[in-house]
């Protein structure tokens, strides 16, 4: 089998272009005397059908997520409102990664951002949202779980990205 040249680079957004929400989760947990990584544990329990998965696919609203996540966390011994978790999702832009993205594009590679996300409910657009929108506009394609109805690590999510880049 002959090797094919690399034509495209797939990027994640949270934890790559933005700082990881896991850092904010840990600060929240510590400030409330909760076990470390509780939020991640809730998110990892029934990962294809839990509140987090449902929200990322836009199968439930943020209000429904609030109640369902609270119930799921309570089942693990500590009630955490889902609204609190949503407030922790906005990471900081990593300028060095934005420069890396610009370099990849300048070198002729196609790019796609693959992100598990939720529909934004904040109005009006704030400064951070403008910054994120401007970064997203750099990508040739953006695949958002909240818009395509599937999420990482589901194979269909990656298939959509490959179809867009073909």
Language model features: what each stretch is:
Residues 14, 148-149:
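Adenine-nucleotide cofactor-binding loop residues
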Residues 23-26, 126-130, 157-159:
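Short, glycine/charged-enriched secondary-structure capping and boundary segments
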Residues 32, 95-144:
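Substrate-recognition/cap helix-loop segment adjacent to the acidic, metal-dependent catalytic center
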Residues 151-166:
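Conserved Lys-Pro-Asp/Glu-containing loop-to-beta segment of HAD-superfamily phosphomonoesterases
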């Amino acid at each position: 089998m002959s090797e094919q040249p690399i034509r495209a680079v797939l990027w994640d957004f949270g934890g790559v272009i933005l700082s990881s929400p896991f850092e904010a989760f840990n600060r929240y947990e510590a400030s409330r005397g909760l076990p470390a990584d509780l939020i991640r544990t809730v998110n990892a329990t029934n990962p294809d059908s839990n509140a987090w998965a449902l929200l990322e696919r836009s199968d439930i609203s943020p209000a429904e997520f609030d109640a369902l996540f609270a119930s799921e966390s309570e089942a693990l011994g500590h009630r955490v409102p889902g609204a609190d978790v949503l407030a922790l999702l906005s990471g900081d832009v990593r300028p060095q990664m934005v420069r890396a993205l610009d370099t990849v594009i300048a070198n002729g590679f196609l790019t796609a951002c693959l992100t598990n996300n939720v529909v934004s409910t904040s109005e009006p657009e704030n400064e951070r949202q403008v910054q994120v929108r401007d970064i997203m506009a750099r990508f040739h394609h953006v695949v958002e779980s909240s818009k395509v109805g599937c999420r990482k690590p589901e194979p269909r999510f990656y298939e959509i990205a490959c179809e867009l880049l073909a």
